[in-house]
Amino acid sequence: MGKEISRIRLNRLYSESNIFEEISFHDGVNIILGEKYDDSSVKGRKTNGVGKSMSIEFLDFGFLNDYEKSRIAKIPKEVFPLEENVILDLDIGDEAITIKRNRKQADQPVIIREGRTVSFDKLQDAREYLTGLIFPKLNGKKVPSFRNLFSILMRDERSEFTDIIKCHDLTKKIPDDLSAHLFL
């Protein structure tokens, strides 16, 4: 099965003008933890408001989520300019991939594959392109989308982490989909 699905390795997430702090990923499982900001006591230090959820939102934006449903859409343009590119560097199989996306043209991402730039007019076309890279030998067969795969690994905090199958916002009535679980 490992030969039918290309390995995905995240390398780094950043913005073109360094508006947010770059996140570098390491091989294996990566956990985003907040740095404790209350140094007055060792016990009970607070990690609220240090950017854990927004880091996940930026990562999800890089993975081509629906911009309108994202918390990134709510950031004032004075804080995060609409033209600022969010850049995600990753490897799919043996190929270096860079995904560039900004809020002004959120539905028109750019994917750089081994130095060659591919621009998309529709978000869905870019998603299908990435799905084809992840499942190169399963073309034409029913496979989960790469967005489906990542919903398991990068869970929405509104899923309440209570059910391994329900990895989406529990306030939405989304039917259970086991396909991504079966591929992992």
Can you name each region flagged by the protein language model?
Residues 1-95:
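Extreme N-terminal "head/tail" segments of very large remodeling/mechanoenzyme assemblies
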Residues 48-56, 119, 123, 174:
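Short, charged, low-complexity patches
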Residues 55-58, 100, 125, 129, ...:
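Alpha-helical scaffold elements adjacent to nucleotide-binding pockets in ATP/GTP-utilizing enzyme cores
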Residues 47, 118, 138, 168-170:
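A general boundary/transition motif marking the beginning of the first structured unit of a protein
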Residues 87-113:
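Gly/Lys-enriched N-terminal cap/neck module of very large, oligomeric protein machines
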Residues 141-184:
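Extended, Lys/Glu-rich alpha-helical coiled-coil stalks
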Residues 104-159:
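Glycine-rich phosphate-binding loops of NTPases
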